[in-house]
Amino acid sequence: MAAKRNAVTTEAPESSAPGEGTALALDSRLSKRVESVIPKKRHEALKWFGWGYNDSQFYGKDGIICFRGEKYPLGGCELPSFTKWVEKKFDLRVDTTKQYPQLPRTYPRPVENAPFLHELKGTTQVDYSAEGIDRLVRCHGQTLNDIYSLWHHKFRRIPDLVVWPRCHDEVVQLVRLANKHNVMLVPFGGGTSVSGAITCPQNESRMICALDTSQMNRLLWLNRENLTVCFESGIVGQDLERVLRSEGLTVGHEPDSYEFSTLGGWVATRASGMKKNVYGNIEDLVVRVRMVTPSGTLERECSAPRVSCGPDFNHVILGSEGTLGVITEVVLKVRPLPSLRRYGSLAFPNFEQGVLFMREVARRRCQPASVRLMDNEQFMFGQALKPEKSWWASVVDAMKQRYVTSWKGIDLNQICAATLLFEGDLKDVQRQEALIYEIAEKFQGFPAGGQNGERGYILTFVIAYIRDFGLHQGIVAESFETSVPWDRCSLLCRSVKQRVVSECSKRSINYYTISCRVTQTYDAGACIYFYFGFRSTDVADPVELFEAIEHSARDEILSCGGSLSHHHGVGKIRSHWYRNAVTETGSSLYSAAKRHLDPKNIFALGNLLPLEEAQASPPPPTSSTPPKAKL
């Protein structure tokens, strides 16, 4: 089928915003589509072969690693310290001659379902495309495997068609047509998944249609009295916050993928943001959510802040990872913008003291908006990412280092750091700071400056670009995360790092890095991130090797009492462990919900349960088997 696009450009039908009348809207302009930073043709602004903007990238120049792009403070900087860190850690020189991959000349031939296409064109006003590049950029997320497969043109199965619904009603039409004609649907939001969740099943024989929600990004209504807002699910995080900031409000949900991920994706993966201490995780922010399934629309009929009305079906949708339907609209809590934002940082003599500090902060429930603890390896990595300094700045840094090592008696090979973000009014921030620094002192911590704290949070959005630069230079690297009770936190960090070291030794990997950080704190535990990478220049299949070691690390995490995931989700790459994580009974309950809501397996992504298990039919009923209960 030649690439085509529906020529209809009429305004989308108005959404039936759940439970709220138009009298509650701030004004009529709120129901207009938001002009997004990401265009409909994603590849015009974003890389087709990796993370982020086309004009933002690490690169080598005259043997020095640099960063280009005006969207980040690091743009235009040379990074000689980072260059030395890479050369020492991985024993390689920066190669400035290697080229980045080129777009493929041909694309997999699309599978066509003629009756579906006929009805799509004849009975709907939905825009669509079968162009190769539109299909390619929506065939993957951001796992190492995804990007490596793109670079080497390994994808055998990509969406056969891309559709852009503009509202809830058009999603209803599309799901009805797909169910009628047995077409597989892949809900696609920001494409930032790191769990393999949106990768097309490579053996799927049906027509695959990527349902891109990017044109569903309206703010439908805002209720200032209740401090609630309703957005369509396709709005990107930075667009959502920009719109709310213009009204003096914020949701406060800032995951590391905030620039590109969507509201619907946050709900589908049970996302967490760096400021959850103040605003909550996504499940704390969601008041109401609307999802279209092949069996109908699932939503709660009340916008009350809390109900006791049986199981909460919001939580059937939260974490469903695109396997049950398409999330179309979300009602969220909002808060007034804080009047003050202030950064800080702390240094501790070792990681164990830092963990004890984090535990005490959580115990006393005095967390600032964000507090993150880095181990020594990650601390040194962050220091290496500082741009080239002036002579005087170098002298000052040397004096600071002498103060830490000579006067404080701290070993630079053991030191770790915590970054801090405070939000509120002046009195709130001053109170938070005083208490945090008082607690830190009990664990031999001392202030390390607001500038270091600010740099740490700024680098959050730049670090994702390093993975692709590393791949370009012959280094495979990726992060993985978990959550764990406090009494096993330090043990898990040590054990997982030791397991990775052991696995590298078994495989004769001599040049690698493994580090961790504690990124979120709770009453009963914490979230831990691990960063692992190794030199792959002499490895036949580096991604397969990386995944084998990561698999071992995940086994170690689980054996130490950690979770399968804190916020990345299960997807395909962790589905192997899902049944054990939720028990046989829990897995069967999910499967029953899947069969009821999606009996033809239209959303056959293979997330959560492996694809063959998700497709399995229930046992045939017998005379003693009661009828299935409806959800």
Swiss-Prot record:
Q: List the residue ranges of the region (Important for enzyme activity).
A: 566-568
Question: Where does it sit, as one GO cellular component term?
Answer: peroxisome
- Subcellular location(s) per record: Peroxisome
Give site residues, Important for enzyme activity: 372
**Chain residue ranges for the region called Disordered:** 1-22
Pathway listed: Glycerolipid metabolism; ether lipid biosynthesis
Q: Which GO terms describe its molecular function?
A: alkylglycerone-phosphate synthase activity; FAD binding
Q: Which residues bind FAD?
A: 187-193, 256-262, 269-272, 321-327
Q: Tell me what reaction this enzyme catalyses.
A: a long chain fatty alcohol + a 1-acylglycerone 3-phosphate = a 1-O-alkylglycerone 3-phosphate + a long-chain fatty acid + H(+)
Per the UniProt entry, the disulfide pairs are none
Which Pfam families does the record associate with it? FAD-oxidase_C, FAD_binding_4
Which InterPro entries does its entry note? Alkyl-DHAP_Synthase, FAD-bd_oxidored_4_C, FAD-bd_PCMH, FAD-bd_PCMH-like_sf, FAD-bd_PCMH_sub2, FAD-linked_Oxase-like_C, Oxid_FAD_bind_N, Vanillyl_alc_oxidase_C-sub2
Q: Where is this motif: Microbody targeting signal?
A: 629-631
Lineage, top-rank taxon, reads Eukaryota
Catalytic site positions: 529 (proton donor/acceptor)
Q: Which residues form the FAD-binding PCMH-type domain?
A: 155-337
Query: What keywords would UniProt list here?
Result: FAD, Flavoprotein, Lipid biosynthesis, Lipid metabolism, Peroxisome, Transferase
Q: Does the keyword Cell inner membrane apply?
A: no
The entry's substrate-binding residues are 467
Identify the PROSITE patterns for this entry.
FAD_PCMH
The answer to keyword Flavoprotein applying to this record is yes
Q: How does it assemble?
A: Homodimer.
Give the family, as the similarity comment puts it: Belongs to the FAD-binding oxidoreductase/transferase type 4 family.
Q: What does this protein do?
A: Catalyzes the exchange of an acyl for a long-chain alkyl group and the formation of the ether bond in the biosynthesis of ether phospholipids.
Protein's name in the database:
Alkylglycerone-phosphate synthase
Per the UniProt record, the source organism is Drosophila melanogaster (Fruit fly)
